[in-house]
Amino acid sequence: SKDGLKFTFHQRKGVKFHNGEELKADDVLFTINKMMDKKAANINSYQFEMIKGAKEVLAGKADKVSGVKVIDDYTVELTLSYPYAPFLASLTSAPASIFNRKAVEEGGDKFGFDPEYTVGTGYMKFKDWTQDKEINLVRTDDYFNDPAKISGVRYLMNIDKSTRRMMFENGELDYMPIDKTIYDTYVNDPLWKDNLIKFLAPSMDYLIFNQNDPNMAKVDIRQAVTKAINREVFNQT
């Protein structure tokens, strides 16, 4: 809407969760209510707190987020309590991922741990997880878009840098992030320099004023701090 308070989303048809359930507007409704549920104590509830009625649910004063309206199976309308410029950008972040109602309700405490109930809509699905050791993903063959070109991914966790480097150089790892401490070693090595890949990682960094602080609640102080920031230097760091 022109006042920046109302957003209407038309969902793509045929997008399926890994349990075969189609993603529908009801899943969006369920997700937002679940994220704001006081009992869930979700650390990512801030993603939706600007939606009308969300803070009331988080405070235990209401059962449902009033600003979420299901129009039909593939259309949902979200109404905000106040204009929030980064709203659309925040919805693209991982904490705003949509849950499948059936998987969460049937899985209970197993959701997030058991592959049967931990489902998404991506081109890779959860196969198994050995806590603090590894996570295995496999290709989703009925993915709604172009399928992955590899059959799966194995993530190894909690490997110290020296062991990780040795495994990579022995061909036991296909990919390894490097930091500045070993960058020069690889970039100057004829064997490895052509295998280095530089890329821009999509991210959004920002500074936020805590307006619960009486000083930061004053617009003059916020403007003064904003004007004092050297944007050119800030953007280069």
Q: Residues of each region from the PLM?
A:
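Gly/Pro-rich hinge or "lid" segments in bacterial periplasmic/extracellular proteins
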Residues: D63-S66, L80-A148, G152
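Surface-exposed binding/hinge segments that line
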Residues: T8-H10, D27-L29, M36, S45-A103
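Alpha-to-beta junction loops
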Residues: V28, Y74-V76, E169-I178, W192
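Ligand-site clamp/hinge motif
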Residues: G107, G112-P115, T140-Y186, Q223
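Aromatic- and charge-enriched surface segment that lines or borders ligand/interaction sites
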Residues: S1-I43, E77, M167, N215-A217
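Ligand-binding "clamshell"
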Residues: T185-K198
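Periplasmic-binding protein-like
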Residues: L91, I197-F209, N212, M216-T237
